[in-house]
A protein has these predicted regions:
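Glycine- and acidic
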Residues: 43-49, 136-145, 204-212, 241-246
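Catalytic activation segment of kinase domains across protein kinase-like and atypical kinase folds
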Residues: 91, 164-169, 173-232
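Regulatory N- and C-terminal appendages and interdomain linkers associated
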Residues: 4, 8, 206-322
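Phosphate/ATP-binding catalytic cores across multiple sugar-kinase/actin-like superfamilies
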Residues: 151-162
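Beta-strand segments within the central parallel beta-sheet cores of soluble alpha/beta enzyme folds
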Residues: 77-81, 173-176, 242-246
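A generic secondary-structure signal for well-formed alpha-helical elements
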Residues: 69-73, 80, 129, 133, ...
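Conserved ATP-binding subdomain of kinase catalytic cores across diverse folds
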Residues: 4-139, 157, 179-182, 222-223
Length: 322
């Protein structure tokens, strides 16, 4: 897998994961089963491919939290101790994570073949993903265009859901942008505590590229990289293909804002979205930033305030306001 951030890298994939296969589950959905931390892989880049117990448990807890919050995500089937010692900044017990996903194909998977100009492989990969995730498109004349449009809409919805629960991914490169539009790779991620629009938790993100407020900007950039790999599938005429994908990408912000408007209205207790609820949400976020109020705690206290009819419960979140 490639993993575009500021430059193209040939093999920036998951250096410690092995895809075992897939299985049709009881709900009729086919899911991949992957081991993370099992040892060296083609993408290890000199690493040992092992995982310490800390990062494994973190991914288990956060991915399951995201699932139960209703956010599309890979899931954790099990945590296994390997009996080995893993040496990083400290020595810790070795562990493996059994991870499941509807697909582990990322934008970086398409880039891997594109950088080698392996167009036949790109076509096969696109057809595979259409057949697997969007079988209703298989016989459509414009299936590749529609496939890309669905990914853009899915990613816009996903990032809106991240923002609605205060989730900061931390490493939104193309290798971590899932074609199935699920949250994948829980590395330097975190949930927002005191609200800051530009909050960053990743120690490697010195310039705030993946800051909370930038997530809705990075996602369409990543999707543009996907578009570049499939232009030839959309039209033999490159100029025509560019116009098609530009139009689809232009709608990312509209789709993101529409999703976030609905989610933010619900967080405020309204059944339906209106411009007034959107304005209220924005004003509340501004107050939270000035008052350094806890993101989740503030919204939780809204409910408690109504139940107990005590405004001080809500106002206590803003004790730092002058």
């Amino acid at each position: 897998l490639v993993g575009s951030e500021m430059c193209i890298r040939d093999r920036l994939g998951d250096g410690r994961s092995v895809l075992l296969g897939d299985k049709i589950c009881q709900d009729g959905v086919r899911r991949d089963i992957q081991l993370k931390g099992s040892g060296k892989t083609y993408f290890s880049r000199g690493g040992d491919g092992r995982a310490g117990i800390g990062p494994v448990i973190r991914e288990y807890l956060i991915s399951e939290s995201m699932h139960h919050l209703g956010v599309p995500t890979t899931r954790s089937l099990a945590v296994l101790l390997t009996g080995e010692k893993v040496v990083r900044a400290e020595v810790s017990p070795g562990a493996m994570l059994a991870r499941v996903a509807t697909s582990h194909v990322r934008v970086g998977t398409f880039e891997f073949f594109a950088i080698r100009n392996q167009k036949d492989h790109i076509r096969k990969l696109a057809d595979f993903m259409i057949e697997r995730s969007h079988p209703d498109l298989s016989d459509k004349k414009e299936k590749y265009e529609l496939f890309f449009e669905r990914i853009v809409k899915g990613q816009a919805s996903l990032v809106a859901q991240w923002n609605s629960v205060g989730f900061i991914h931390g490493v939104m490169n193309t290798d971590n942008t899932s074609i199935s539009c699920e949250t994948i790779d829980y590395g330097p991620c975190a949930f927002m505590d005191s609200y800051e629009a530009n909050k960053v938790f990743s120690s490697i993100d010195q310039y705030g590229r993946y800051a909370f407020s930038n997530q809705s900007r990075v996602a369409p950039w990543n999707l543009s990289r996907l578009a570049e790999t499939i232009l030839f599938l959309i039209s033999k005429n490159t100029s025509d293909a560019i116009k098609v994908v530009e139009k689809i990408l232009f709608d990312f912000d509209k789709n993101f804002n529409a999703s976030l408007d609905i989610l933010s209205s619900r967080k405020l207790g309204f059944k339906n979205y209106s411009k007034k609820t959107s304005s209220l949400y924005s004003e509340l976020l501004n107050l939270m930033e000035v008052g350094k109020a806890d993101f989740t705690g503030t919204f939780k206290s809204l409910k408690e305030t109504l139940i107990k009819e005590d405004n001080t419960i809500f106002l206590n979140n803003f004790r730092n306001l002058d």
